[in-house]
Design a protein with these regions (language model features):
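N- or domain-start disorder-to-order transition segments that initiate the globular core
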Residues: 1-28
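Active-site-adjacent beta->alpha loops and helix N-cap segments on the catalytic face
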Residues: 24, 117-123, 141-155, 168-179
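Glycine-enriched alpha-helix->loop->beta-strand junction motifs that scaffold or abut catalytic
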Residues: 37-39, 150-161, 195
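Conserved, mostly hydrophobic/aromatic
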Residues: 44, 108, 139, 154, ...
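Flexible, acidic glycine-rich loops studded with aromatic residues
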Residues: 251-353
Length: 354
């Protein structure tokens, strides 16, 4: 166990890796990361697109699939990604079991083209969950208005959910409440509520990238952390109410906030800015490989969330209306980026089978 990751674990923060590929699995790289303290994996279309472009480790399976009569690029991608996620789940299963089902998850995203189609998202979420057939898989659902009922439905069926592309506190609160509604609808005679989990992926650095363009210099590099501290206040409020206490008494768990997009985009910022200032109990920080390596080779001097929050004056940090416009735009941009990455990976598969 790496001492810096252990330091975060002692505050009850998990560190996940925001990367996966067939090569990482086959070479033992993911296993090594888990030995260092990584306790979960997140994936998205961009990650899979890079894996397919940069590795030849998928080529033999693609050939076998086409020879078996599967020529639809999306179906081929589903087969490839389902295998990767299933294999990764098996590597992390001991973590999941040791943590009593509260950690050790691997996330896979619903087709981003379904981000605004509730019915198709539910159908695909169920398909992926049943196909992977591992207790520690999480289905990623975008935090759109159409995604809110998807969260509730999948949770009610006992399917773990990672709510992704959350930029605004409003959408975070809606996703947390959808999770609670889903738990309330679980048939406890068929599903053990103790093993139904969710994380809410709250994006960080992309906010500063956009907000820094329109605010005073004194607040540059601060708004994303401030926004996260306010979301954490929302988390504490939502999961302390009486209706959730009833769920807790039945064995249910609070939805964890997961800090996503935590590598700095501005080269002038400390590389650990969104690690050291986002340490809070019952949270996750998912990091790309370069930030993971930075953590391994650095000494983390973290601030408590209370300290981070006290650094900012709510009235001066940013106008709420302006922030809401920016976070709404970031959601749309995020969806488009994932759609484009999905199109690119489908094109990559077409090229491999032609």
């Amino acid at each position: 166990m790496n001492k810096e990751i252990l330091k975060l674990n002692k505050i009850d923060q998990s560190v996940w890796i925001d990367s996966i590929s067939r090569g990482m699995i086959n070479t033992g790289k993911i296993k090594s990361m888990v030995e260092n303290g990584i306790s979960g994996i997140t994936s998205n279309p961009s990650i899979f697109q890079k894996a397919l472009s940069n590795e030849d480790s998928y080529d033999d399976e693609i050939k076998l699939l086409t020879e078996s009569g599967i020529n639809d690029p999306k179906k081929i991608f589903q087969k490839l990604s389902i295998k990767d996620i299933s294999d990764a789940c098996k590597i992390l299963l001991p973590v999941y079991e040791n943590k009593g089902g509260s950690d050790g998850f691997v996330s896979i995203e619903i087709d981003p083209k379904f981000s605004k189609d509730t019915d198709k998202s539910i159908k695909e979420g169920i398909y992926l969950y049943e196909s992977i057939n591992q207790p520690n898989v999480m289905i990623k659902v975008p935090g759109t208005s159409q995604g809110i009922p998807v969260i509730e439905k999948l949770i009610s069926l006992g399917i773990n959910v990672n709510v992704t592309l959350l930029f605004s506190r409003d959408m975070y609160r809606k996703s947390a409440k959808a999770y609670i509604k889903g738990l309330e609808k679980i048939n406890t005679e068929k599903t053990d509520i103790r093993y139904v989990n969710s994380v809410a992926s709250f994006f960080i650095s992309r906010i500063d990238t956009e907000v820094d363009k329109v605010i005073d210099n004194k607040n540059k590099g601060k708004v994303a952390i401030w926004n996260a501290t306010k979301a954490y206040e929302d988390y504490e409020d939502i999961f302390s109410k009486d209706n959730f206490k009833n769920i807790l008494n039945k064995g249910g768990k609070a939805q964890k906030l997961l800090w996503a997009s935590t590598s700095v985009k501005n080269p002038n910022y400390n590389k650990l800015l969104y690690v050291e200032n986002l340490v809070a109990p019952n949270t996750v920080n998912t990091v790309p490989e370069d930030l993971y390596n930075e953590i391994l080779n650095s000494e983390i001097n973290y601030s408590s969330f209370k300290q981070s929050k006290n650094n900012y004056d709510d009235s001066e940090i940013i106008d709420n209306d302006k922030l809401n416009i920016i976070t709404g735009e970031l959601l749309e941009v995020g969806i488009k980026l994932f759609e484009d990455a999905f199109d690119a990976l489908i094109k990559e598969i077409k090229n491999k089978i032609s």
